[in-house]
Amino acid sequence: VQIKKRTGRLHPITKFEKETVALFEKLGFQRFDAPHIDSDYNNFEALNIPSNHPARDLWDTLYIDSQKYGIEPGKLLLRTHTSNSQIRIMKKFKPPTRLMIIDRCFRYENLDARHEHTFEKFEIVYIDKNLSMGNLQYLSEYFLKNIFGEEIKVRLKPKYYPFVEPGAGVDGECIFCKGKTEKQIGRKLRV
């Protein structure tokens, strides 16, 4: 009796992550990692999100019982975004800088079909002279067209974010219904 050899497959998130990293490596970006457990300072304060800033109301933070480790309560947490890498990058590297962060983030969420306490986030830190919103638009289109196909329609639009200025949102038209459905869910992809 011959036993059929088992073969494994990459998890879809892992596969997507590898594709994304390869795309941005072609443009000269390098991967950068930051810790999952971090200080309140790196996660909020260093990003101009002080304790009373309205941006902190946009997510619920998972704080760690830091007194066990001799750290002031409320000062140690599971990062809520990959942006905790930004202060480290700016301290460690001189411009021009092309780095990407793709990793897990954690938020205290009411779990449902669209919300989970752990999720993956991708972000780039691109610091150089003469960069503009045009560069952001190009990188957004480059990413979406390479992942979802050249036919995807992409739109960059100004958007208010309390922690960054200027801010922009990127919409990608649904590749299945081509934006024809009346339902909001599944019609657009937010980047």
Predicted regions and their residues:
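TRNA-recognition modules of translation machinery and tRNA-sensing kinases, especially anticodon-binding
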Residues: 2-191
